[in-house]
Amino acid sequence: MKYFILSLGCTKNQADSEVIMGILESKGYVRSLNPEESDLLIVNTCGFIAAAIEESIEEILNLVHLKKPGQKILVAGCLVQREGKELAKHLPEVDLFFTPREINNLDKLLADLGENNKLVLSEPGFLNLEKKPRAKSNEVYRYIKIADGCDNRCTYCTIPAIRGKYTSRPLDDILEEIKDTLKQGIKEIILVAQDTTAYGIDLYGEFKLVELLRKIGSIKGNFWVRLMYLYPDKITPELINEIKENPKVIKYVDVPLQHIHPEILKKMGRKGSSEEIISTLERLRKEIPDITIRTTFIVGFPGETEEQFNYLLDFVKKFKFNRLGAFPYYREKGTPAAKMKGQIPKKVKEQRYEKLMEVQQEISLNLNKALVGKKIPVIVEKKIRGENLYLGRTYMDAPEIDGIIEIKAEKRLKKGQIINVLITDYDIYDLKGEFIND
């Protein structure tokens, strides 16, 4: 028996998909990359924004079009949590819709898989507290979900409604999964949650990310720990010091800011003032000079004036983020922002997005140019054309969202090997370099 799975959306969804895969493989299923030869066709959907919903529905319809007698289609994930009843009504070809928490019951759902499509809904959120098996979809890195849900109430965001209240995993459970992951040969641990900095507050009554990092740091071995989704209002001096001093924690932080103008931040429901945010960012750079700071911005939020957008643009020019992503604002039903006055025309939002990314591209090009001649820690991902060329990522680059580096090496390199590379060439986002055998 074979299964085909397509995981859409965020890193947390990828972690959930690997649990689905692990359950299936424990039952004897073998993963296939070809849906036409598979018995089970699975889409783990994203329901965050309109574009993600459209992509999810398009992929479901693609599988419906391919479906042959005897094949079963399963649809999971956030879109089922958000729009399950509508999906089941309009897609009778799908055999099973189930929400993230129902991954715990996947064994039973598969056993009960009948001829008619079925919808199984539950409370939002999934943390695999039952320790279901997890498959390995990548040999180099793994996303470790330390919490699910969100208690922040950003006015544009649907996540609290889809994933539920913020729920942390027990610290020992996380450490156990990390140790098991390292035993499998994976060398990069990426800690993720909707708000990684809030870890532990619901479970222990206080923030526990620093303690978690210290305990991870005591695990033997040569591996990286990467931090994603840090909220600026919870980046404490203690956390900054731990990132600085812990040799396992690479000097990279993903800090989604969404905006910097005080009035827009207030309308977004973001915590912390512009001054506090800037102070935190400056402290990160002062304490850890070689740190890479990634952020994300939303342009075209309701009521955003040209002056407020230029305020954001000037800030980006001045601060020079190492990595930056941006999105035009999406009007999501059920959110306070969707009802706000001053909705920005699509064309204006797109123009602002293009303008921001043009500024960032110039910044990125200059930052990469400055790396030429320097030695940078790199993790090897795979071998490419020729006998001595490999692809990897510097510590400054997270998988899928940041750049890559082409490595020339006279000796054979292994996947997951952490090496020093001399930077020899660059473009806007990517680098080239030579392996230095120190």
From Swiss-Prot:
GO terms for cellular component: cytosol. Its EC number is 2.8.4.4. GO terms for biological process: tRNA modification. Its main location: cytoplasm. Keywords: 4Fe-4S, Cytoplasm, Iron, Iron-sulfur, Metal-binding, S-adenosyl-L-methionine, Transferase. It is found in: Cytoplasm. [4Fe-4S] cluster 2 binds at C150, C154, C157. One of its GO terms (molecular function) is protein methylthiotransferase activity. Its cofactor is [4Fe-4S] cluster. Residues 369-437 form the TRAM domain. Residues 1-115 form the MTTase N-terminal domain. It catalyses: L-aspartate(89)-[ribosomal protein uS12]-hydrogen + (sulfur carrier)-SH + AH2 + 2 S-adenosyl-L-methionine = 3-methylsulfanyl-L-aspartate(89)-[ribosomal protein uS12]-hydrogen + (sulfur carrier)-H + 5'-deoxyadenosine + L-methionine + A + S-adenosyl-L-homocysteine + 2 H(+). [4Fe-4S] cluster 1 binds at C10, C46, C78. PROSITE patterns: MTTASE_N, MTTASE_RADICAL, RADICAL_SAM, TRAM. It comes from the Bacteria. Residues 136-366 form the Radical SAM core domain. Binds 2 [4Fe-4S] clusters. One cluster is coordinated with 3 cysteines and an exchangeable S-adenosyl-L-methionine. CDD domains: Radical_SAM (cd01335). Belongs to the methylthiotransferase family. RimO subfamily. Catalyzes the methylthiolation of an aspartic acid residue of ribosomal protein uS12. This is Ribosomal protein uS12 methylthiotransferase RimO. The lineage of its organism: Bacteria, Bacillati, Bacillota, Clostridia, Thermoanaerobacterales.
